[in-house]
């Protein structure tokens, strides 16, 4: 049993050592990662807003602006994840993850969204601690998406 424990300990030590050898200090610094490879963001849950009776042509125009705003914020490095929810009982419409540290920094960005400004969408915003690598999502997505909505 002692021999098995020693082999397991050596294997674990080798695994940890290999993982530590993969650390890229320059990348961690560029992404603003802490010692765990993490950083603060703001997670936003978009919900159905109070204006549910907008005419179809107005809704279409608002959501075209919503998509254009998403693209603008992503290109500017402020929005790193965005996407819709499937239909659900909570009336959650989608999520944003903003590359800002505080809710107070995200709120002005949210107010630039035509769907939020028109009341078609409402939001809840929360401080969130996640992998600094999420900032690479937009660049990777642009390489794998054939079309844009």
Name every feature range the model reports, one short phrase each.
Residues 19-149:
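Conserved, structured core segments of small domains
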């Amino acid at each position: 049993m002692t021999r098995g424990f020693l082999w397991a300990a050596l294997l674990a030590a080798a695994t940890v050592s290999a993982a530590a050898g993969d650390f890229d200090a320059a990348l961690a610094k560029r992404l603003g990662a802490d010692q765990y490879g993490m950083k603060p963001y703001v997670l936003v849950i978009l919900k159905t807003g109070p204006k549910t009776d907008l005419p179809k042509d107005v809704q279409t125009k608002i959501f075209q602006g919503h998509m254009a705003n998403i693209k603008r914020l992503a290109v500017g490095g402020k929005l790193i994840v965005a996407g819709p929810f499937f239909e659900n009982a909570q009336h959650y419409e989608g999520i944003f993850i903003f590359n800002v540290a505080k809710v107070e920094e995200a709120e002005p960005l949210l107010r630039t969204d035509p769907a939020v400004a028109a009341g078609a969408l409402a939001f809840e915003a929360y401080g969130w601690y996640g992998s600094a690598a999420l900032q690479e999502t937009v660049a990777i997505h642009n390489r794998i998406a054939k079309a844009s909505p």
